[in-house]
């Protein structure tokens, strides 16, 4: 890890809770002087679908047996360099430089069809925000890029050069829930160039008619453009759907989200696949079997202590569920 990459090491959110969830336990062992009691020594294959700087992965590795495997995914080239360094010192780690939306195909290329646990920490990481050159921050100057993977795809600046006002406004509204999307979109499209995040943030600030105290007026617009350019919500949907065939029965799914657009998707997915539904055709004499792919999901938020130590954790939610093999017939009232 380079000195620059070390400077961006950050605290993983809901660290203990997420790792315990993906291992299917209520809590990790308390650390004692007896090292033999400090690890669950879990065997199997696990996936950290968003490696970042490896906070969750490192704690998970401490709980895995020597014969276990941890596969880590990330789109960010810097994150991949950190992951590869970890893999060079721990043979249990395998690295995939790609989106977790490629989960099934990437695992198949390794000869893996099912895993024991899936974990993801969605959205943008603190190191990405704090590195102004990436373009994610409206508080630090940099190129208007915002790509998670800077080695491929179109930057936000390139997209803004060609997008029309209406499409931009729709993106700001749909992915940022920005109520003043049309006014802001018109102001953005009147800019002569898109080379500076601070310039872009200032234009949005001036165009925004109603500032919320304690919240920068460019917050939702930057979020919207980032989510759109990286297809974040589409990737989340693909990842969740792939979790059904990829997880073994008894395997664990644990996903951390930071805003309502992500959290709503996870919530609805788990609700849909954790309880039976009657068929849409009411004329059928009896409902067909409906697969129940997950147990009743649970949700956990950060503690007051974690929020105090890491204010960026305040909006985080961890949703978790266990993969089941239950196929059942919905009860019918006579």
Curated annotation (Swiss-Prot):
Taxonomic classification: Bacteria, Pseudomonadati, Pseudomonadota, Gammaproteobacteria, Moraxellales
Annotated PANTHER family: 12S RRNA N4-METHYLCYTIDINE METHYLTRANSFERASE (PTHR11265:SF0), S-ADENOSYL-METHYLTRANSFERASE MRAW (PTHR11265)
Ranges for region Disordered: 272-318
Basic residues composition bias: residue spans: 289-301
Recorded GO CC terms: cytoplasm
Binding site for S-adenosyl-L-methionine: 54-56, 74, 100, 121, 128
The organism's place on the tree of life at top rank: Bacteria
Pfam families linked to this entry: Methyltransf_5 (PF01795)
Keyword Transferase annotated: yes
Known function: Specifically methylates the N4 position of cytidine in position 1402 (C1402) of 16S rRNA.
Protein name from the UniProt record: Ribosomal RNA small subunit methyltransferase H
Keywords: Cytoplasm, Methyltransferase, rRNA processing, S-adenosyl-L-methionine, Transferase
Entry's family note: Belongs to the methyltransferase superfamily. RsmH family.
HAMAP family named in the record: 16SrRNA_methyltr_H (MF_01007)
Organism in which the protein naturally occurs: Psychrobacter arcticus (strain DSM 17307 / VKM B-2377 / 273-4)
Catalytic activity, reaction form: cytidine(1402) in 16S rRNA + S-adenosyl-L-methionine = N(4)-methylcytidine(1402) in 16S rRNA + S-adenosyl-L-homocysteine + H(+)
């Amino acid at each position: 890890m380079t000195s620059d990459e070390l400077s961006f090491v950050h605290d993983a959110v809901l660290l203990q809770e997420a790792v315990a969830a993906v291992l299917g336990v209520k809590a990790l062992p308390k650390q004692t002087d007896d090292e033999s009691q400090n690890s669950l020594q879990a065997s199997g294959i696990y996936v950290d679908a968003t490696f970042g700087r490896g906070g969750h992965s490192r704690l998970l590795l401490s709980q895995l047996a020597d014969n276990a495997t941890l596969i880590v995914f990330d789109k960010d080239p810097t994150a991949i360099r950190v992951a590869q360094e970890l893999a060079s010192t721990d043979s249990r780690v395998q690295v995939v430089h790609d989106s977790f939306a490629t989960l099934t195909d990437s695992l198949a290329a390794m000869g893996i069809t099912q895993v024991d646990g899936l974990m993801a920490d969605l959205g943008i990481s603190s190191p990405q925000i704090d590195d102004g050159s990436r373009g994610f921050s409206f508080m630090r100057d940099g190129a208007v890029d915002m790509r998670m993977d800077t080695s491929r795809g179109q930057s936000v600046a390139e997209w803004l050069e060609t997008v029309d006002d209406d499409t931009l406004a729709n993106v700001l509204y749909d992915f940022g829930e920005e109520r003043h999307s049309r006014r802001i979109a018109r102001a953005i499209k009147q800019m002569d160039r898109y080379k500076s995040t601070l310039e872009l943030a200032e234009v949005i600030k001036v165009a925004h008619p109603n500032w919320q105290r304690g919240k920068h007026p460019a917050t939702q617009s930057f979020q919207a453009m980032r989510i759109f350019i990286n297809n974040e919500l589409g990737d989340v949907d693909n990842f969740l759907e792939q979790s059904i065939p990829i997880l073994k029965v008894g395997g664990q799914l644990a996903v951390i989200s930071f805003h309502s657009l992500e959290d709503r998707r996870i919530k609805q997915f788990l609700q849909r696949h954790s309880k039976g539904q009657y068929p849409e055709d009411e004329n059928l004499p009896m409902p067909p079997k409906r697969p129940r792919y997950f147990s009743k999901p649970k949700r956990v938020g950060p503690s007051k202590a974690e929020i105090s130590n890491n204010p960026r954790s305040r909006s985080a939610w961890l949703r978790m569920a266990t993969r089941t093999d239950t196929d059942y017939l919905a009860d019918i009232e006579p």
